[in-house]
Amino acid sequence: MQMHHFFIPEIGLLTIDTQSLPWSTKEHPMEIPMDESLELYQWMTHACPSPVPLLLGTSFQQKVWNALCKIPFGETISYQDLAIQIGQSKAFRAVAMAAAHNPFPLVIPCHRLIRSDGSIGGYSAGSGPELKEKLLLWEQRLAQELHLNSRSKQ
């Protein structure tokens, strides 16, 4: 069991105990209804506070996790570019390690990190890179659809 502590000003100190339970491996169809997609999109875009009020992790990990929260929904950034963004241009491997130790993979969207060559890279949650690829495809499709919908309303 792992204990995670974080502070939310409006609430106070929260402690979350997690057990090592297996992830569900059931396939979820990519074609989910738009209203359900929008609901998940809303949650994923507003779930990550900035700065992340975590009381765990090193200062470097927290810097990486905060930067991850600023990657827009449906977009990606390379490990190298994120390292440059946080002022640690040679620390791209350390960025990958910080992402791998992310305590809340969907809330802090480490799946939006990719390799400089455009390949997926690793992912510590669920089925690993396979899940990461599905999340990225879903986000990109939904972001594109939302963009098209907003253009058609203008």
Q: What feature does the model see in each segment?
A:
Residues 90-105:
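Regulatory, non-catalytic segments
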Residues 1-89, 142-154:
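Basic nucleic-acid-binding alpha-helical/helix-turn surface characteristic of O6-alkylguanine DNA
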Residues 116-154:
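…primarily DNA-binding HTH/wHTH and HhH modules…
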Residues 63-67, 94, 134:
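Pre-recognition alpha-helix immediately N-terminal to the DNA-recognition helix
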Residues 10-13, 104, 119:
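Short acidic/polar mixed-charge low-complexity motifs
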Residues 68, 82, 110-111, 135:
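Residue-level signal for inorganic ion chemistry
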Residues 105-113:
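Extracellular LysM carbohydrate-binding repeats and other cell-envelope/extracellular binding modules
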